[in-house]
């Protein structure tokens, strides 16, 4: 349950972006989906479904602070300089 999970913020790099169209079975509506894979500093990968606006802002190779709760994406604050982690405002 995401609501009982702790909110965590970790240093992470965008390693993959995925998008596609989901067709709703009953209404046959076509709904776009957007997912991003992040690599943590320990090498582990986490994948989250995100909103289209956030998806457009992220580029493969971006480094920043990923905030999430369980398997729910909250936000990603890109570092101004890709070469080093630094304190940024929380998103």
Predicted regions, residues:
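OB-fold (S1/OB) nucleic-acid-binding surfaces
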Residues: 25-46
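Beta-strand/loop nucleic-acid-binding surfaces
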Residues: 43-57
